[in-house]
Amino acid sequence: AEGGAPLKMRLLKGCNLEMETVISSLRGWPNPILSTKTEVDANYLHILERALLPENAKALHIGVASHNLFTIAYAYLLSQKNNSSEYMTFEMLEGMADHVWRAQSQLGNHIILYAPVVKDEHFLNAISYLVRRMDENTAPDNFLTHSFNLKPGTDTWNFLQKQFEEAYHKKDSVS
């Protein structure tokens, strides 16, 4: 009766990039997609930082949807620093990087695993979803492309760490 129920916001990136571009073009709108992966990552970190401030986290429960270890670690540390971890969940696709969510669970973090489900009449949507996931997950700058057998100190680790650091240093200058 008094209201005040928190909202749930799922923070993710890279989803439906092509469709956003097509729709904005068809409707004569400016393209909402940032021009580089670094800008997208920086914007994600910027929004995450704002969402996990104590005064925001209580009203806006945030789902950190990512398989990127650097992003997950940043969210974890930020939520600890801000005492806002009780208002945050980590969200991951079932069957993708299961070792990551298991480790998060052992730390006591709240985990939501999800899997796409469609009715028979929407099966074509499932095919397009799978094709999009395969395209995203095999892109050279996508974390999951490099995540198997990832070890600290390797060239791959250093590449991914550099990606994260570049985004981190730009997080306060993106819109």
Predicted regions and their residues:
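Positively charged, amphipathic and often flexible ligand-engagement surfaces
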Residues: 1-175
